């Protein structure tokens, strides 16, 4: 192939002289490595490359080599580059480019996967040589350096040669490789797919070509394999200069792409700058890839800046290539290679300079911290170069005997997989290759007929650990873990699903994996096993499976849609046998919910749920989803047995054994009285299902745990803030039990923040401190706890302890991190924002042998469950949780198996504050309220509480909250303002001595003791008594006594002042004031405002002036249990569904709120819906326009918690999607059979798309929401996986096309519903209907108003304007359809008019369709006013009705004037008449109205223009007709202007009428009137100036009032008259503004009240809501682009639709409706 010769030429030119062993070895080492680094087999290569290549590739290669040599000379001259040198210097080439070949290979491979490749082999064999060369090239470059190192002459290039071979032979053959989906990410830099055929090369290109021609071809193949991920590489075409012959593959390659772009396509693209350095000159390019360095050594090794001159080099990750192909480059080499993405270099430099500047001025601690972060990042990047799994291979082997492998990289998602050269991977990761092939050939894959699934075997206990458990390292289970395994096995044999509830740290993960291993080996049950785990523990599960059960194939099902699709493609099932490949599937809750239909389709042999307390709420979506999965056995794994109630325990039992524990009521009745009588019966019932061991029973070797409560005073600043918070909230506090719970909770949160640190209340300004020392001192002095912690940490550091510090508040962790940096204590941090891989690294770094890390900061609740930090021996709980269970778990992270030292736990509590009281109460309350499963035989004794408490609630009621808030307040207020004492200086040893201390004893003494132990309280019964005595005393005092009056007064005065300022300040000043008062640093300001969702009048809240405008419509307490982020997600998902309140499960799934109960979700949903309705009602006075600019309509908004909701938008989305909700069956089985009831027009996608696909798309939108295209693609039941969102971004349908299509289909459904409704209401027969038509229509119109309204609402997405091409396509569609129509319509006795619904309606002899030729002529003539045509039906968003009318009028005048101009070239009246008609028909395609109507409207507009210009009434008096309307508006009179009889005759003669009736009776019987009502009614219907409902719209809108008998009078007037009129029009242009005032008035006068009442929803901002006149049938249909886009809904500006119109619309194919109008 061309590729070959190119390659050869490259080789020769580079001095390799290998003639062209295209097949691979030569090329492999050739382009880069052999020439430059000759590491591979360089000795033989460089000299004998010719011979090598000759021998390998044979005659083919020789002939090619000749050509290539000639080419070489030509190419090599201009750049005069030595190939090897250049190779080194241009890393981007480094990744061999195999573009053409790759492509071919891919195509072939694709085929191969289906055909097993045999045909392709033959077909591609010709090209294979060539391809292989290309492949080789690629490999050569990269791998060569590395791999081939001694491979010898023929294959000497090792990777290259293989790759070449790959490329060559396999290029053709490889192309068949089964597994390479076209669009996977490739690992090497993919060359561009298309090679230009032009033959011209620029110097740069040539240069590059020299080195990489071989590679490139190679790349091409790769490219295919890899997908188009990296389309840019070298700008050289490797085929062009070669022979002129082209094979079919080449043609294929080019035809899909734009040939002109090819050149750019061939350049490599920079994806990312990873690092920079000063390096040795020339130490760049391919020789710096990781594999080249391993083979040849690092060209930069031993470089010292001081001794030699260096240059700045950048480590570059190339787009489309994996990280092993990263190279070091200089700016110069990048420019030489003409790479794309150079803008990134500037950005990187800028950032780098900023960092350097910062480092210069930063303190040593900061620098150290920065360096640690860098180190972590570098470690992460190193992992990206390790192959974690191989998931596919190519069919063809390269010369070196290796296929290419599709690799998944460690730490990167599946979407980053890439194709790599086989030899390269084999050299480094042979173990992964072996694993891959053993997985592929494994016989131990799941099969349905496993007999133990149907009948469980007898249980045989395992006396000792079986050899298959423990993996290659022969790890041993502890005795209690073996017991646990036996218990799990016993439960399985008995058919009992169960709960493993061992305390944290006892190895539940290992026991579960051993159990699966037991099923696998003992009972040949190979799966599929589903493990659902939290993201935070996913990596540790993966690691443990690898360690303990390496024989089982575990796949991690995670990542974005691309990653998950790739897993389905490569890791899911064997394509031939259709048997599943994996044994274990690991996934997270979120992914499970996203892909529930896919994952739920499998029959699982086992489902295990880790951290199963997520399932304690049987009303949550996660619970409901998972319980529906088909499974043979279920296991719940939880370290925190049930926290709050018996109901939660029942939920878990019901989940595992729904038949046995079917009813909560029965369960409660049986065991609810347990508290009085003990729980013996419950224990007995639980025994088979629940296993709970605690550490102290099973792990005697575990060292003791000692906990101390350290109480400290507040600092002076804290006291001040604490009092301040209470004083400012005096009003709320004094309400006592009448106050709101959420109000108290918010105040309490503020006080808790204050107890932790003052910065949480008011962060300091950025420039507040002069130096680090001062900042550190201020930081410490702002919190009593931190003063103590500082002393404690210094002492612990001296002793060599390692510390875990827990806080609930992430912002507190920020402050602690800042403190640790000032103190230069090395630390790690983990909170919710730290993602999987970084999190894992931080843990590994902390636990590593000899780790320097002293502290680990953790948030109490962040995904830390199951995290092992046993290398720490001290735990500091900075602030206690409401729920002591969470603190227990926090402690367990250090006090767990593997711990060798005593664990000290320090709990910090602020004396005399809410914190202390919460702790006291929690001790007592939690013992009673929390279900603690103690040891009872295996299960432990239980303290159970029957009530079901809502998950989000706090454990305290209002009275208790009020009492807690009073605790300590009185003492505080005794210190005068400004004289608060600093806490006394105390020695840390003294503090520790005084602390309340308790060690854990071997076994609990009293019931609930384990829970109590954390509080160090010996006996809780005394506590209860104290409690009773204390309560009255504390509660008796009220807030007036506690807060001094002087302070209350001062606060009230301040508030009054603020209110006055608010009143007198201008809005702009007010805003400035707000900003100023919101002090300092931007970042902190936002933080300080964000009060954990609190709406209380807390300090900063009060400092801010009150917001103007309406008060918040919804009090905050209504949304307990939802954070602002969750509410935002909920609203976003809410807008995706029709009837969202009936689809809460789908909304919650989409919003990832599956843990919430349906009750909570319903409450929030109703809050959103009702809030929107109310806001729209309140705002019915009109739209608020943002910033006064047109186009931006900011509808009424309201707030839910901190989230602003656009009411209009939400309601409009709800209404737009309502037809879909009504049409799609809710029953899943019926839904599978759903077919769209309307005829649809062709989609014009790049794939076959039919009615079935439309139906599936609608079902997908129903199930997953509008816009969730990727979810729809993933659902196998919808069969759209291969059809939508193709990987090639240039292929349709992508998201934009799907949106357009969906909008169109939903409109069809809407019309269909309206039609059915109209039919339902139609009832009586024709004759009756005809007589009473007007009355009936009126009634129907009002009845159906609601139905139809949704028609006019904006579609969920606003489309961008369609471009000219689309317009042309539409025009063509119309033409072809018109042709079809003319064929289909039977001849009628009477003249007919073809309506948009393709129903014949008789009119006169004239037809309103244009033949193709006329249409084209009209199109050309009207091109100058194309813009006006497009805008005719599409007013800008946000215009008022008056402005919309004006807009349409102006467009009509422009269009009409242009038509008048066009007609001037004719003299023959007949011609003029004919062309006027043709042009207006053309115009009618752009709007709802037909040609006559438009012409008439135009004439009225002209008259108005004349009238406003001339201000004289002469015409009026002469033209008034008998039915003059007595309306003060002069314009109204105008509209009945000179109509002579001829005009009446031509449009609405009696003859026409009778024909119409006859025709109608004969042909259409019952449907007749509907037809006539449709969009183009017979014109007789207008003879009285009224529409089919007997409504006279022109009465309402003077502009268009006219006697419709006198239609088209212009056609019959003399030419003089016309020219006169035109003259007037021209004169009057520009004076049209006079109209607007009166129009508006008239408009509103005649507006019915019902219309106003609906003003709030966006669909009601209609265009001309009063003209109900003459709407064409497709009005509400997906008429035209204009229609879809108008925010005012699908109705044209010119009218509502009647139910009849709807009904007729859909009588026949909507396809015609749509396309006949759309041009």
UniProtKB/Swiss-Prot annotation:
InterPro entries in UniProt: CDH1_2_SANT_HL1, CHD1-2/Hrp3_HTH, CHD1-like_C, Chromo-like_dom_sf, Chromo/chromo_shadow_dom, Chromo_domain, Chromodomain_CS, Helicase_ATP-bd
Report biased composition (Acidic residues) as residue ranges.
117-133, 161-178, 212-222
- Comp. bias (Basic and acidic residues): 1-10, 66-85, 239-248, 1369-1380, 1526-1576, 1585-1673, 1698-1710
**Which residues make up the binding site for ATP?**
502-509
Q: Motif DEAH box: residue span?
A: 610-613
Q: Where is the composition biased (Polar residues)?
A: 1511-1524
This protein's name? Chromodomain-helicase-DNA-binding protein 1
| Record gene name | CHD1
């Amino acid at each position: 192939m061309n590729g070959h010769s190119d390659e050869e030429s490259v080789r020769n030119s580079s001095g390799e002289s290998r003639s062209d062993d295209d097949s691979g070895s030569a090329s492999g080492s050739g382009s880069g490595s052999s020439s430059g680094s000759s590491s591979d087999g360089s000795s033989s290569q460089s000299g004998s490359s010719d011979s090598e290549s000759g021998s390998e590739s044979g005659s083919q290669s020789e002939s090619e080599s000749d050509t290539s040599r000639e080419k070489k000379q030509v190419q090599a001259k201009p750049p005069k580059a030595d190939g090897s040198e250049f190779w080194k210097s241009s890393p981007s080439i480094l990744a061999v480019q195999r573009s053409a070949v790759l492509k071919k290979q891919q195509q072939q491979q694709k085929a191969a996967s289906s055909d097993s490749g045999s045909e392709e082999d033959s077909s591609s064999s010709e090209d294979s040589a060539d391809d292989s060369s290309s492949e080789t090239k690629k490999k050569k470059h990269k791998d060569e350096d590395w791999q081939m190192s001694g491979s010898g002459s023929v294959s000497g290039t090792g990777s290259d040669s293989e790759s070449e071979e790959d490329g060559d032979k396999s290029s053709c053959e490889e192309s068949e490789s089964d597994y390479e989906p076209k669009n996977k990410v490739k690992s090497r830099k993919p060359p561009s797919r298309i090679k230009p055929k032009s033959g011209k090369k620029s110097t740069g290109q040539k240069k590059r070509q020299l080195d990489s021609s071989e590679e490139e071809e190679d790349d091409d193949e790769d490219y295919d394999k890899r997908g188009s991920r990296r389309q840019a590489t070298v700008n050289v075409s490797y085929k062009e200069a070669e022979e002129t012959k082209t094979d079919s593959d080449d043609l294929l390659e080019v035809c899909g792409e734009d040939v002109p772009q090819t050149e750019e396509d061939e350049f490599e693209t920079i994806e990312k700058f990873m690092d920079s350095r000063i390096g040795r000159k020339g130490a760049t390019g391919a020789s710096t890839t990781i594999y080249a360095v391993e083979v040849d050594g690092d060209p930069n090794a031993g470089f010292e800046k001081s001794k030699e001159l260096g240059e700045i080099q950048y480590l570059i990750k190339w787009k489309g290539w994996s990280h092993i192909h990263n190279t070091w480059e200089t700016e110069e080499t990048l420019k030489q290679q003409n790479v794309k993405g150079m803008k990134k270099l500037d950005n990187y430099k800028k950032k780098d300079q900023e960092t350097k500047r910062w480092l210069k001025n930063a303190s040593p601690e900061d620098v150290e911290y920065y360096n640690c972060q860098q180190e972590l990042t570098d470690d992460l990047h190193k992992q990206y170069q390790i192959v974690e799994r191989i998931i596919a291979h190519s069919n063809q082997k390269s010369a070196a005997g290796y296929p290419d492998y599709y690799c998944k990289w460690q730490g990167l998602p599946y979407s980053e997989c890439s194709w790599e050269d086989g030899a390269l991977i084999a050299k480094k990761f042979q173990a992964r290759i072996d694993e891959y092939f053993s997985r592929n050939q494994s016989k131990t894959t799941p099969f349905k007929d496993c007999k133990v699934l149907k009948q469980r075997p007898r249980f045989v206990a395992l006396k000792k650990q079986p050899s298959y458990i423990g993996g290659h390292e022969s790890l041993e289970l502890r005795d209690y873990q073996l017991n646990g395994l036996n218990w799990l096995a016993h439960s399985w044999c008995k058919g009992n699903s169960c709960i493993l509830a061992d305390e944290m740290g006892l190895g539940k993960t290992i026991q579960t994996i051993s159990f699966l291993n037991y099923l696998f080996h003992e009972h040949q049950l190979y799966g599929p096993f589903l493990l659902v785990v939290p993201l935070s523990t996913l990596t540790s599960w993966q690691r443990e499976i690898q360690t303990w059960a390496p024989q089982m194939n575990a796949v991690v099902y995670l990542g974005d849609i691309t990653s998950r699709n790739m897993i389905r493609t490569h890791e899911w099932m064997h394509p031939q046998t259709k048997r599943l490949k994996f044994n274990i599937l690991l996934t997270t809750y979120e992914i499970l919910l996203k892909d529930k239909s896919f994952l739920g389709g499998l029959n699982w042999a086992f489902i295990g749920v880790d951290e199963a307390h997520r399932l304690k709420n049987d009303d949550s979506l996660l619970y409901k989803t998972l319980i529906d999965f088909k499974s043979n056995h279920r296991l719940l794994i939880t370290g925190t047995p049930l926290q709050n109630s018996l109901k939660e325990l029942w939920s878990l039992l019901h989940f595992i054994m729904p038949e046995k524990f079917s009813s909560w009521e029965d369960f409660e009745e049986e065991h609810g009285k347990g508290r009085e009588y003990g729980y013996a019966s419950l224990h007995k019932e639980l025994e088979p299902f629940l296993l709970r061991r605690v550490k102290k029973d099973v792990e005697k070797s575990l060292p003791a745990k000692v906990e101390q409560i350290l109480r400290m005073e507040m600092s002076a600043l804290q006291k001040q803030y604490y009092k301040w918070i209470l004083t400012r909230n005096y009003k709320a506090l004094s309400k006592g039990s009448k106050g709101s719970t959420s109000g108290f909770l918010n105040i309490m949160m503020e006080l808790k923040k204050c107890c932790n640190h003052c910065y949480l209340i008011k962060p300091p300004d950025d420039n507040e401190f002069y130096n680090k020392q001062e900042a550190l001192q201020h930081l410490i002095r702002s919190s009593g706890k931190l003063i103590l912690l500082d002393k404690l940490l210094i002492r612990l550091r001296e002793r060599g302890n390692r510390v875990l510090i827990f806080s609930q508040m992430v912002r507190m962790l920020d402050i602690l991190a800042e403190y640790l940096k000032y103190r230069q204590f090395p630390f790690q941090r983990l909170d919710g924002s730290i993602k999987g891989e970084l999190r894992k690294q931080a843990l590994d770094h902390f636990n590593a042998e000899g780790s320097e890390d002293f502290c680990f900061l953790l948030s109490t609740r962040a995904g830390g469950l199951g995290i092992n930090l046993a290398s720490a021996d001290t735990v500091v709980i900075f602030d206690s949780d409401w729920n002591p269970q969470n603190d227990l778990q926090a402690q367990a992270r250090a006090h767990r198996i593997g711990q060798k030292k005593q664990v000290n736990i320090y709990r910090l509590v602020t004396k005399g504050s809410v914190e202390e009281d919460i702790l006291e109460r929690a001790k007592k309350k939690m013992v009673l309220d929390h279900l603690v499963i103690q040891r009872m035989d295996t299960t432990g004794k239980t303290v159970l509480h029957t009530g079901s408490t809502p998950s989000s609630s706090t454990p305290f009621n209002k009275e208790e909250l009020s009492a807690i808030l009073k605790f300590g307040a009185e003492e505080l207020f005794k210190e005068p303002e400004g004289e608060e004492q600093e806490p006394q200086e105390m020695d840390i040893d003294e503090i520790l001595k005084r602390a309340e201390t308790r060690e854990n004893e071997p076994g609990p003494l009293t019931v609930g003791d384990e829970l109590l132990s954390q509080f160090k309280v010996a006996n809780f019964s005394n506590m209860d008594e104290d409690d009773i005595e204390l309560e009255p005393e504390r509660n008796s005092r009220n807030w007036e006594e506690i807060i001094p009056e002087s302070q209350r007064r001062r606060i009230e005065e301040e508030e009054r002042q603020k209110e006055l300022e608010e009143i007198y300040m201008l809005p702009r000043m007010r805003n400035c004031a707000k900003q100023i008062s919101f002090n300092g640093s931007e970042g902190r300001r936002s933080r300080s405002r964000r009060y954990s969702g609190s709406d209380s009048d807390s300090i900063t809240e009060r400092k801010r002036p009150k917001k103007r405008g309406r008060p918040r419509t919804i009090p905050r307490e209504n949304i307990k249990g939802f954070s602002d982020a969750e509410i935002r997600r909920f609203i976003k998902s809410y807008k995706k569904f029709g009837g969202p309140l009936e689809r809460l499960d789908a909304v919650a799934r989409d919003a990832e709120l599956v843990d919430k109960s349906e009750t909570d979700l319903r409450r929030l949903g109703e809050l959103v819906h009702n809030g929107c309705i109310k806001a729209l009602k309140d705002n019915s006075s009109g739209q608020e326009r943002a910033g006064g600019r047109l186009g931006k309509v900011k509808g009424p908004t309201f707030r839910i918690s901190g989230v602003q909701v656009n009411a209009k938008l939400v309601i409009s989305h709800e209404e737009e999607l309502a037809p879909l909700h009504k049409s799609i069956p809710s029953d899943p089985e019926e839904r599978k059979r759903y077919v769209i009831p309307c005829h649809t027009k062709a989609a014009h996608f790049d794939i076959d798309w039919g009615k079935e696909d439309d139906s599936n798309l609608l079902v997908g939108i129903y199930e997953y929401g509008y816009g969730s295209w990727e979810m729809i693609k993933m659902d196998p039941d919808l069969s759209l996986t291969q059809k939508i969102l193709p990987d090639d971004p240039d292929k349709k349908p992508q998201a934009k096309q799907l949106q357009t299509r969906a909008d169109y289909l939903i409109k069809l459904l809407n019309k269909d519903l309206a039609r059915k409704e109209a039919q339902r209401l139609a009832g009586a027969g024709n004759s009756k209907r005809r007589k009473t038509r007007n009355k009936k229509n009126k009634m129907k119109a009002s009845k159906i108003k609601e139905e139809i309204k949704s028609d006019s609402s904006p579609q969920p997405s606003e489309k961008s304007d369609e471009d000219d091409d689309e317009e042309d396509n539409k025009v063509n569609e119309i033409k072809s359809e018109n042709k079809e129509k003319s064929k289909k319509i039977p001849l009628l006795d009477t003249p007919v008019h073809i309506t948009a619904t393709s129903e014949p309606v008789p009119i006169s002899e004239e037809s309103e369709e244009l033949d193709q030729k006329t249409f084209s002529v009209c199109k050309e003539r009207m091109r100058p006013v194309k813009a006006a045509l497009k805008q005719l039906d599409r007013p800008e968003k946000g215009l008022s009705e008056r402005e919309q009318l004006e807009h349409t009028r102006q467009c009509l005048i422009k269009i009409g004037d242009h038509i008048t101009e066009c007609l001037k070239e004719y003299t023959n009246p007949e011609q003029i008449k004919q062309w006027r008609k043709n042009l207006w028909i053309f115009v009618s395609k752009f709007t709802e109205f037909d040609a006559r109507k438009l012409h008439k409207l135009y004439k009225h507009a002209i008259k108005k223009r004349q009238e406003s210009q001339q201000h004289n009434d002469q015409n009026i008096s002469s033209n008034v007709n008998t039915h003059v309307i007595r309306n003060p508006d002069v314009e109204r009179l105008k509209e009945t202007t000179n109509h002579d009889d001829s005009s009446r005759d031509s449009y609405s003669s009696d003859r026409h009428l009778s024909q119409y009736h006859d025709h109608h009776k004969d042909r259409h019987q019952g449907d007749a009137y509907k037809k006539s009502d449709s969009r183009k009614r017979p014109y007789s219907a207008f003879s009285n100036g009224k529409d089919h409902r007997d409504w006279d719209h022109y009465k309402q809108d003077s502009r268009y009032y006219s006697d419709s008998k006198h239609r088209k009078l212009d056609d019959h007037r003399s030419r003089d008259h016309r020219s006169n009129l035109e003259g007037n029009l021209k004169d009057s242009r520009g004076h049209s503004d006079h109209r607007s005032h009166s129009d508006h008035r008239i408009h509103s006068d005649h507006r019915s009240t019902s219309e106003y009442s609906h003003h709030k929803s966006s669909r009601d901002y209609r265009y001309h809501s009063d003209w109900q006149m003459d709407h064409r049938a497709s009005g509400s249909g997906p008429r035209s682009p204009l229609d879809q886009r108008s925010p005012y809904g699908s109705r044209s500006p010119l009218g509502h639709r009647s139910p009849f119109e709807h009904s007729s619309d859909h009588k026949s194919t909507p396809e015609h409706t749509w396309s006949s109008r759309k041009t």
